[in-house]
Curated annotation (Swiss-Prot):
One GO location term (cellular component): plasma membrane
Keyword field contains Membrane: yes
UniProt subcellular location: Cell inner membrane; Bacterial flagellum basal body
UniProt KW keywords: Bacterial flagellum, Cell inner membrane, Cell membrane, Membrane, Transmembrane, Transmembrane helix
Protein name (database record): Flagellar biosynthetic protein FliR
Gene behind the chain: fliR
Main location: membrane
Record family assignment: Belongs to the FliR/MopE/SpaR family.
Any single Pfam family the record assigns to this protein: Bac_export_1
GO biological process, one term: protein targeting
Length: 261
Protein backbone atom coordinates (compact mmCIF):
# COMPACT_ATOMS: atom_id res chain seq x y z
CA UNK A 1 0.00 0.00 0.00
CA UNK A 2 1.32 3.39 -1.01
CA UNK A 3 2.02 5.63 1.95
CA UNK A 4 2.36 9.37 1.63
CA UNK A 5 4.13 11.25 4.37
CA UNK A 6 3.20 14.70 5.60
CA UNK A 7 6.42 16.07 4.09
CA UNK A 8 5.34 14.84 0.66
CA UNK A 9 1.91 16.40 1.07
CA UNK A 10 3.49 19.73 1.99
CA UNK A 11 5.89 19.42 -0.95
CA UNK A 12 3.03 18.88 -3.40
CA UNK A 13 1.05 21.69 -1.82
CA UNK A 14 4.05 23.98 -2.13
CA UNK A 15 4.50 22.99 -5.77
CA UNK A 16 0.94 23.53 -7.01
CA UNK A 17 -0.72 25.96 -4.60
CA UNK A 18 1.24 29.13 -5.42
CA UNK A 19 0.96 28.82 -9.23
CA UNK A 20 -2.73 28.01 -8.83
CA UNK A 21 -3.32 31.33 -7.04
CA UNK A 22 -1.68 33.30 -9.86
CA UNK A 23 -3.57 31.41 -12.56
CA UNK A 24 -6.90 31.73 -10.75
CA UNK A 25 -6.41 35.48 -10.31
CA UNK A 26 -5.75 35.83 -14.04
CA UNK A 27 -8.79 33.75 -15.03
CA UNK A 28 -11.00 35.74 -12.64
CA UNK A 29 -10.10 39.03 -14.34
CA UNK A 30 -9.21 38.03 -17.91
CA UNK A 31 -11.57 38.70 -20.83
CA UNK A 32 -14.17 36.02 -21.65
CA UNK A 33 -13.30 33.83 -18.67
CA UNK A 34 -14.25 36.52 -16.16
CA UNK A 35 -17.82 36.60 -17.50
CA UNK A 36 -20.37 35.57 -14.90
CA UNK A 37 -21.96 33.30 -17.48
CA UNK A 38 -18.89 31.04 -17.26
CA UNK A 39 -19.48 28.50 -14.45
CA UNK A 40 -17.11 28.64 -11.51
CA UNK A 41 -16.36 24.94 -11.92
CA UNK A 42 -15.12 25.61 -15.45
CA UNK A 43 -12.86 28.41 -14.20
CA UNK A 44 -11.46 26.26 -11.41
CA UNK A 45 -11.00 23.25 -13.68
CA UNK A 46 -9.19 25.31 -16.32
CA UNK A 47 -6.96 26.89 -13.67
CA UNK A 48 -6.05 23.47 -12.30
CA UNK A 49 -5.27 22.12 -15.79
CA UNK A 50 -2.95 25.04 -16.54
CA UNK A 51 -1.32 24.71 -13.11
CA UNK A 52 -0.71 20.97 -13.48
CA UNK A 53 0.84 21.63 -16.90
CA UNK A 54 3.30 24.35 -15.86
CA UNK A 55 4.05 23.61 -12.19
CA UNK A 56 6.45 20.66 -12.73
CA UNK A 57 8.74 22.85 -14.85
CA UNK A 58 8.95 25.63 -12.25
CA UNK A 59 11.93 25.94 -9.90
CA UNK A 60 11.36 24.41 -6.50
CA UNK A 61 10.78 26.63 -3.48
CA UNK A 62 10.81 25.87 0.21
CA UNK A 63 8.35 28.48 1.45
CA UNK A 64 6.64 27.39 4.69
CA UNK A 65 2.98 27.01 3.79
CA UNK A 66 1.64 27.84 7.26
CA UNK A 67 3.40 31.12 8.03
CA UNK A 68 2.96 34.88 7.76
CA UNK A 69 5.41 34.90 4.87
CA UNK A 70 3.11 32.48 3.02
CA UNK A 71 0.25 34.95 3.46
CA UNK A 72 2.32 37.70 1.84
CA UNK A 73 3.32 35.33 -0.95
CA UNK A 74 -0.33 34.46 -1.61
CA UNK A 75 -1.23 38.15 -1.87
CA UNK A 76 1.68 38.68 -4.25
CA UNK A 77 0.59 35.88 -6.59
CA UNK A 78 -2.97 37.22 -6.65
CA UNK A 79 -1.75 40.74 -7.44
CA UNK A 80 0.35 39.50 -10.36
CA UNK A 81 -2.56 37.57 -11.85
CA UNK A 82 -4.97 40.46 -11.40
CA UNK A 83 -2.51 42.87 -13.04
CA UNK A 84 -2.32 40.67 -16.14
CA UNK A 85 -6.06 40.15 -16.51
CA UNK A 86 -6.99 43.72 -15.63
CA UNK A 87 -4.57 45.16 -18.18
CA UNK A 88 -6.04 42.96 -20.91
CA UNK A 89 -9.46 44.37 -20.11
CA UNK A 90 -8.25 47.80 -21.26
CA UNK A 91 -8.60 46.74 -24.91
CA UNK A 92 -12.23 45.71 -24.48
CA UNK A 93 -13.02 48.78 -22.40
CA UNK A 94 -11.72 50.93 -25.28
CA UNK A 95 -14.01 49.17 -27.76
CA UNK A 96 -16.99 49.51 -25.41
CA UNK A 97 -16.20 53.21 -24.96
CA UNK A 98 -16.21 53.65 -28.73
CA UNK A 99 -19.60 51.92 -28.92
CA UNK A 100 -21.03 54.18 -26.22
CA UNK A 101 -19.77 57.33 -27.97
CA UNK A 102 -21.13 56.21 -31.34
CA UNK A 103 -24.46 55.26 -29.80
CA UNK A 104 -24.68 58.66 -28.14
CA UNK A 105 -24.09 60.43 -31.46
CA UNK A 106 -26.64 58.22 -33.23
CA UNK A 107 -29.30 58.80 -30.58
CA UNK A 108 -29.18 55.21 -29.32
CA UNK A 109 -27.93 56.02 -25.83
CA UNK A 110 -31.41 55.30 -24.45
CA UNK A 111 -31.38 51.76 -25.91
CA UNK A 112 -29.78 49.83 -23.06
CA UNK A 113 -30.04 46.37 -21.56
CA UNK A 114 -28.54 44.58 -18.58
CA UNK A 115 -25.02 43.33 -19.23
CA UNK A 116 -24.81 39.68 -18.04
CA UNK A 117 -21.17 40.15 -17.01
CA UNK A 118 -21.48 43.21 -14.78
CA UNK A 119 -25.27 43.29 -14.25
CA UNK A 120 -25.18 46.97 -15.21
CA UNK A 121 -27.04 48.80 -17.95
CA UNK A 122 -24.96 48.93 -21.13
CA UNK A 123 -25.88 50.54 -24.47
CA UNK A 124 -26.80 48.00 -27.12
CA UNK A 125 -24.19 49.27 -29.57
CA UNK A 126 -21.46 49.05 -26.91
CA UNK A 127 -22.42 45.43 -26.21
CA UNK A 128 -22.33 44.59 -29.92
CA UNK A 129 -18.87 46.11 -30.24
CA UNK A 130 -17.75 44.24 -27.13
CA UNK A 131 -18.94 40.90 -28.51
CA UNK A 132 -17.21 41.62 -31.81
CA UNK A 133 -13.96 42.39 -29.97
CA UNK A 134 -14.26 39.11 -28.04
CA UNK A 135 -14.65 37.14 -31.28
CA UNK A 136 -11.66 38.93 -32.81
CA UNK A 137 -9.64 38.25 -29.66
CA UNK A 138 -10.24 34.52 -30.08
CA UNK A 139 -9.57 34.74 -33.83
CA UNK A 140 -6.17 36.32 -33.23
CA UNK A 141 -5.34 33.62 -30.61
CA UNK A 142 -5.22 36.27 -27.93
CA UNK A 143 -6.10 33.72 -25.26
CA UNK A 144 -3.01 31.68 -26.16
CA UNK A 145 -0.80 34.77 -26.05
CA UNK A 146 -2.20 35.63 -22.64
CA UNK A 147 -1.42 32.16 -21.29
CA UNK A 148 2.07 32.42 -22.78
CA UNK A 149 2.63 35.72 -20.96
CA UNK A 150 1.39 34.10 -17.77
CA UNK A 151 3.96 31.32 -18.11
CA UNK A 152 6.68 33.92 -18.73
CA UNK A 153 5.86 35.59 -15.42
CA UNK A 154 6.92 32.45 -13.54
CA UNK A 155 10.40 32.79 -15.07
CA UNK A 156 10.65 36.58 -14.88
CA UNK A 157 9.27 36.66 -11.34
CA UNK A 158 9.62 33.18 -9.83
CA UNK A 159 7.67 32.21 -6.74
CA UNK A 160 9.78 33.17 -3.78
CA UNK A 161 8.38 36.32 -2.24
CA UNK A 162 10.77 38.83 -3.81
CA UNK A 163 9.42 42.39 -3.45
CA UNK A 164 7.56 43.85 -6.41
CA UNK A 165 8.41 47.10 -8.12
CA UNK A 166 5.68 49.65 -7.42
CA UNK A 167 6.56 51.50 -10.64
CA UNK A 168 5.10 48.60 -12.62
CA UNK A 169 1.71 49.08 -10.96
CA UNK A 170 2.02 52.84 -11.50
CA UNK A 171 2.54 52.17 -15.22
CA UNK A 172 -0.57 49.99 -15.10
CA UNK A 173 -2.71 52.86 -13.80
CA UNK A 174 -1.28 55.29 -16.34
CA UNK A 175 -2.12 52.82 -19.10
CA UNK A 176 -5.79 53.45 -18.36
CA UNK A 177 -5.55 56.39 -20.75
CA UNK A 178 -5.47 53.82 -23.56
CA UNK A 179 -9.18 53.23 -22.95
CA UNK A 180 -10.20 56.78 -23.85
CA UNK A 181 -7.53 57.34 -26.50
CA UNK A 182 -8.26 54.21 -28.54
CA UNK A 183 -12.00 54.44 -27.96
CA UNK A 184 -12.06 57.99 -29.29
CA UNK A 185 -9.85 57.06 -32.25
CA UNK A 186 -12.21 54.23 -33.23
CA UNK A 187 -15.30 56.42 -32.96
CA UNK A 188 -13.75 59.55 -34.48
CA UNK A 189 -14.84 58.97 -38.13
CA UNK A 190 -18.47 58.52 -37.12
CA UNK A 191 -18.31 61.42 -34.66
CA UNK A 192 -17.05 63.72 -37.43
CA UNK A 193 -19.65 62.69 -39.99
CA UNK A 194 -22.57 62.71 -37.56
CA UNK A 195 -21.50 66.09 -36.21
CA UNK A 196 -21.47 67.42 -39.78
CA UNK A 197 -24.96 65.98 -40.29
CA UNK A 198 -26.23 67.65 -37.11
CA UNK A 199 -24.76 70.97 -38.23
CA UNK A 200 -26.51 70.59 -41.59
CA UNK A 201 -29.79 69.85 -39.85
CA UNK A 202 -29.30 72.93 -37.68
CA UNK A 203 -28.77 75.12 -40.75
CA UNK A 204 -31.81 73.56 -42.39
CA UNK A 205 -33.89 74.41 -39.34
CA UNK A 206 -32.77 78.03 -39.55
CA UNK A 207 -33.52 78.22 -43.27
CA UNK A 208 -36.88 76.40 -43.10
CA UNK A 209 -38.34 76.74 -39.60
CA UNK A 210 -41.59 75.11 -40.71
CA UNK A 211 -39.80 71.76 -41.05
CA UNK A 212 -39.91 69.54 -37.96
CA UNK A 213 -36.25 68.74 -37.40
CA UNK A 214 -37.06 66.36 -34.56
CA UNK A 215 -39.20 64.25 -36.89
CA UNK A 216 -36.66 64.30 -39.72
CA UNK A 217 -33.42 64.41 -37.75
CA UNK A 218 -33.73 61.29 -35.61
CA UNK A 219 -34.50 58.75 -38.38
CA UNK A 220 -31.97 60.44 -40.67
CA UNK A 221 -29.24 60.37 -38.01
CA UNK A 222 -30.05 56.76 -37.17
CA UNK A 223 -30.02 55.68 -40.82
CA UNK A 224 -26.76 57.46 -41.58
CA UNK A 225 -25.19 56.10 -38.38
CA UNK A 226 -26.11 52.50 -39.20
CA UNK A 227 -24.80 52.93 -42.75
CA UNK A 228 -21.54 54.34 -41.43
CA UNK A 229 -21.26 51.46 -38.94
CA UNK A 230 -21.64 48.99 -41.81
CA UNK A 231 -18.90 50.82 -43.72
CA UNK A 232 -16.69 50.85 -40.61
CA UNK A 233 -16.96 47.10 -39.93
CA UNK A 234 -14.08 46.07 -42.25
CA UNK A 235 -11.78 48.48 -40.37
CA UNK A 236 -12.60 47.16 -36.89
CA UNK A 237 -10.58 43.94 -37.32
CA UNK A 238 -7.22 45.62 -38.11
CA UNK A 239 -7.89 48.24 -35.44
CA UNK A 240 -8.52 45.56 -32.79
CA UNK A 241 -5.45 43.64 -33.95
CA UNK A 242 -3.32 46.75 -33.42
CA UNK A 243 -5.03 47.41 -30.08
CA UNK A 244 -4.42 43.86 -28.82
CA UNK A 245 -0.79 44.06 -29.94
CA UNK A 246 -0.38 47.34 -28.06
CA UNK A 247 -1.86 45.82 -24.89
CA UNK A 248 0.34 42.72 -25.13
CA UNK A 249 3.43 44.92 -25.51
CA UNK A 250 2.28 46.85 -22.45
CA UNK A 251 1.87 43.58 -20.55
CA UNK A 252 5.36 42.49 -21.53
CA UNK A 253 6.78 45.81 -20.27
CA UNK A 254 4.89 45.51 -16.98
CA UNK A 255 6.11 41.94 -16.48
CA UNK A 256 9.71 43.00 -17.11
CA UNK A 257 9.37 45.85 -14.58
CA UNK A 258 7.74 43.79 -11.83
CA UNK A 259 10.97 42.38 -10.31
CA UNK A 260 12.60 44.85 -7.93
CA UNK A 261 16.25 44.76 -8.97
Amino acid sequence: MLQVTSEQWLSWLNLYFWPLLRVLALISTAPILSERSVPKRVKLGLAMMITFAIAPSLPANDVPVFSFFALWLAVQQILIGIALGFTMQFAFAAVRTAGEIIGLQMGLSFATFVDPASHLNMPVLARIMDMLALLLFLTFNGHLWLISLLVDTFHTLPIGGEPLNSNAFLALTKAGSLIFLNGLMLALPLITLLLTLNLALGLLNRMAPQLSIFVIGFPLTLTVGISLMAALMPLIAPFCEHLFSEIFNLLADIISELPLI
